[in-house]
Curated annotation (Swiss-Prot):
GO terms for biological process: translation. The keyword Kinase does not apply. GO terms for molecular function: structural constituent of ribosome. HAMAP family: Ribosomal_uL30_B (MF_01371_B). This is Large ribosomal subunit protein uL30. It comes from Proteus mirabilis (strain HI4320). GO terms for cellular component: cytosolic large ribosomal subunit.
């Protein structure tokens, strides 16, 4: 089984760049406090790096 990471949204999407909103949607995050589990891949890591100021990551 592939390694997974937990991603939690900690900040609002209001007033953010459209690209950042789309990245959050791509990660599956919808609201503050929402947590999703994603496979730990370079693509997902890149998405997290783009919106790192709005999310908390747990290994």
């Amino acid at each position: 089984m592939a390694k997974t990471i937990k991603i939690t949204q900690t900040r609002s999407l209001i007033g953010r760049l459209p690209k950042h909103k789309a990245t959050m949607a791509g990660l599956g995050l919808r609201r503050i406090g929402h947590t999703v589990e994603r496979e730990d891949t370079p693509a997902v890591r890149g998405m997290i790096n783009l919106v790192s100021y709005m999310v908390k990551v747990e290994e």
